[in-house]
Amino acid sequence: NRRYIGNKHKLIEWIFSILDKECDKSGSFVDIFAGTGVVAAVAARHFDEIVLNDFLHSNHAIYQAFFSKGEWSREKIDNIIKDYNNINGEDLEDNYFSENFGGKYFSKNSSKIIGFIRENIEENKANLTDKEYYILISSLLYSIDKVANTVGHYDAYFKKNYIEDGFFMR
C-alpha cells in the first residue's frame, strides 16, 4: 500500500460493476491513469492482457515488479532484503539521498540506508534478472513510503525537531 493522492481503491467495486455490464471480460484492459496499479491488479484476474500508463518512472518500476512476466528467485530476493535490513545507518557515509533528503523527509540514518540500498541495487543490476531488479526497486519504494515524513507526496514535509529512525525493507 503506497501513499498516493489519486487513490482509486474506493472506486474498484464501481468500476468493475460497470465493466461486468458493458464489457466482454477477455482481451485487453487499458488503465490510462494507472497510478499505483490497484485497478490493473483486479483487472489482471479478468483480462488476457493489461496495458498500464503513467508518467512516473517509479510507477513503471512497480508495474514491472507486479505485472511483468520474468524469472526471479524469491530466496535470492529475501536474502538480499535480509542483508539490507542488517545495515546500520550510523556505519554509512553520507550519499546523494542522505544529503538531499535526510533530516527533512527521512531521518539522517534512514536516508543513508535508503541511499546506500538504491546505489547497491544499481551496482548489482548485472547480477539480477529484470524482474528481480524491479522487485527490489519496488520494495524499496514501498518501504520508503512507510517511513516518509510526508502526507503522501514530496512537495512538502512535516517540520519536526526529531525524525524517528525506522527504515525497514519489506
PLM-predicted stretches and their roles:
Residues 1-28, 38-46, 62, 69:
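S-adenosyl-L-methionine
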Residues 49-51, 55-170:
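Class I S-adenosyl-L-methionine-dependent methyltransferase module
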Residues 33-37:
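Class I SAM-dependent methyltransferase "Motif I" SAM/SAH-binding loop
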Residues 3, 7, 31, 102, ...:
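Conserved aromatic-histidine-acidic binding/catalytic patches
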